[in-house]
Amino acid sequence: MSKTRRLLLLAILLIGVCCGVSAKTLVAYYSFTNNVRTIVNELATQKEVDVVEIQPAEEGLDYAANNYALGTQLLNAIKTAPNDAASYPEIKPVSADFTQYDDIIVATPLWWSQMAAPMQTFLFNNGAAMEGKNIWMIVSSANSGISGVVADAERLIPNGVFQSNKLWIKSSQVPQAASMLNTWLVETGQVSAINNQKMVVLSDPHVMAPGLLVSEGTAWTTYLSGQRKLVDYSQRLFDDMIVRIKRDLRPGLVLISGDLTKDGEQVSHEYVINKLDELRAIGIKTLVIPGNHDRGSNSDAVYYDGESTTAATVATNGWFATQYANYGYGVGSEREGTTLTYACEPITGLVVIGIDSGTDGNVSETTLDWVVEKATAARASGKKVIAMMHHPLMPHFAGVDNFVSTAVVGNYETVRNTLADAGIRVVFTGHFHTSDIAKDWNADMTREIYDVNTGSLISYPCDYREVTMSADFTDMAITTGRIADEALPKRIKVTDGNHNVTFELNETSAAQSLYNMLPTTKEVQNYSTNEKIFYPETAISYSSDCIEGACPAGTLALFSPWGNVVMYYGDASQYPGLYILGNAVEGAGQISELTGNITVSKVEIAKERLNTAVKNQIAAKGTAYSLIAPTAAQAFVIHAEGNETENASAATTLSTLVSAAEMGKAFIGEAKAQELKDMASSMLEDKSQYGTDRENVTNDLTLSIELPEAIKLAADGYSTYCSENRLDISRTTGVTAYIVNNVTETTVELQEVSVLPAETGFILKGTGNAWYDLYKTEGVADDVSGNQLHGTLTATLAPLNTFALSTKKGVTGFYPVNAGLMIPAHKAYLTATGSMARSLSIDGEVTGILNVDSYVNAIPAEFYSIHGVKVARPTKGIYISNGKKVVIK
């Protein structure tokens, strides 16, 4: 067989082809020392690419032996006759459809200042097919420059569009390849830059280190049998999530709200940290908080070895903080003593407070005081504050503690009120393994607070959150993504009503084609003595990625000449056109029993496991509960999917549960029956704070939240302010805004306003030392054309004749300040002639004395009450002095 034909036989399956999406970038690489392979493997996690590896036809050749004697010989042969195919060493067959691609990345090592010989063979054979393609170069070498490699590529791809920015990674730089690749990909426009206005929020990945499963056996299967979590897929799901973050989401910050590991095993934590290091290498920051499964004694923290288990070493608080120093517990963070609660500013202007709710779901009063202190300090600096905590902040439906005793943080009302009063508007939580957002308020219902509970990465539906922030962090847009569909293996179920077989499909295009046309009902037929067959709804599409081979019992295959699907219950040998689709994982022995019409449907691994686990959990409560367990489990699945009221099955499921609770009164009592009704209604109508004046429905999957600007008024109840945003003061209770519409020699006349244009200086009046939230608006602003206040968005040097709002000896007014002093950011000042301080006059009514300086420096000798009675020692109040009304505060 000719070399050219061999080059067209073997394909490496391209992800885009399997999924029915045309890929845009092909990476062709050759690696001898594994350096280029390492680089390309990392590249594939940062950019969606299809990869083909170039391999010598003869295995085991040592090109480096005897000072690269063989490698030099091959290069010399090419140099001698570069246009002769016989000059190039043979390589294993490679197939690639170049018409699919706009961009081709050639990744190769350098041999003696030239391109490695096997890569030259590949380009010699395929260079013409790369005409008009964008050609990118990645070269690895010890020290030599790469110009010779580039020259070889340009010779072998004469009509390629070579890109000027080549990436040269020296052998010594391979450990830094992730960072170098990211920089190169961003600079060349192949991927988007890391977005510091975006966060990704994960929770409860429960990663189990591969080494904990020494060997499969009853110890492992017994543990799994009661799980609703996909612990057996935890590594796969976490790995895929890390790739999605690096390649697709590219946020500036990742938050993980606890239960990082299966049960606190140090080896599992080490696995998690290694993956987080991948994010850090390309500039993505991560902050974590521990959950109840992450440290301390846990009987499930074991190695599984056949029928036995051995205890694994678990993390302590100190060990956890040390190991996660780069992820919340190191430089740049403040910790509350030796606890695992901390505060940091991962992105300028955004402070994150990680609250450790312990293994029992409690937050101490001392910790709460510390959190308030840090939140207050951050707000005083004009920064936005969010928090994360493992245990949910509030109940998300009535009776939630019937599912998990620690479903809500202990003393939750106090925690809720404290955080809300401290100006924390959003808390990201986990623990309950469902993605549900609940809203509540502080004690007097003047401040909103949201509990954004994110589901477990290994529990259906395997959710994560994507959070996009406005540039000033005043707007937060939350969306919800799911990882299971792409990360978990594809399974299908074949049943005739009495016999069931579950197959796990491989990743070939033919298997994907079958999966995409399900569900379907077909007649099963006997064929030969070892197989059952059926004809799919439409022809299965397949490509060169299909797998031929022997088919042992339990194999699912496509017989392409006839287009039928084959289920083997006896061994079969390899046959031309017989392509393997997958293998039975359950019920292989029932294939031979299938008869009549069969239904072939998709199996949702995560959903099925959750449904089964919850059903068993409820049934275990007793006979009466077992009767409603299937429906109750369905209700919980609907809840896990979020936005329950949009689910077509929710109303029917609720009606069934309410009826069942009513009929079950005789067995469980009226109180318990009502509790079940409330739980079902709250859950399936998506109502948090059910049955109270706080009851509300909040979108669980897509939500925009305002993070208002905050200002603390001075002790006298006045402050100046200036914002980048248009503000609607009418939305804020208890505070009034004013602009200055006239300045005289003795007074500053104020005019009340409601909607202020952006970058407008103004005065706020309210309760002294109180915090107020200020909200953005798109509404029409008031006319402030006559405003004489100058706002500052950044710290500004005071010009000549500057006056600032202040209180001296109990008198509030505008006092002169020295030129050159710094006016803080987001404040306002006046400029006026003279050096006399000015009083405040609101709507023509003087609220301070006419001559502030005179009052401060020497109190007038005579004061009279408004009724004309002379007052020898005036206290706070309104008086007449020198024929003018004055106010003493």
Write out the residue ranges for each language-model feature.
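C-terminal outer-membrane/trafficking sorting elements
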Residues: 21, 739, 845-889
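N-terminal beta1-alpha1-beta2 submodule of the flavodoxin-like/Rossmannoid cofactor-binding fold
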Residues: 24-106, 113-115, 179-186
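Acidic/histidine-rich helix-loop elements
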Residues: 66-82, 206-238, 301-311, 324-331, ...
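N-terminal active-site segment of His-dependent metallophosphoesterases
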Residues: 193-266
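His/acidic metal-ligating clusters that form di-metal
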Residues: 233, 238, 243-253, 285, ...
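Extended active-site neighborhood of metal-dependent phosphoesterases/phosphodiesterases
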Residues: 266, 270-373, 445-448, 453, ...
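Binuclear metal-dependent phosphoesterase catalytic core
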Residues: 436, 444-488
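A short, polar beta-strand/turn micro-motif
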Residues: 706-733, 751-847, 887
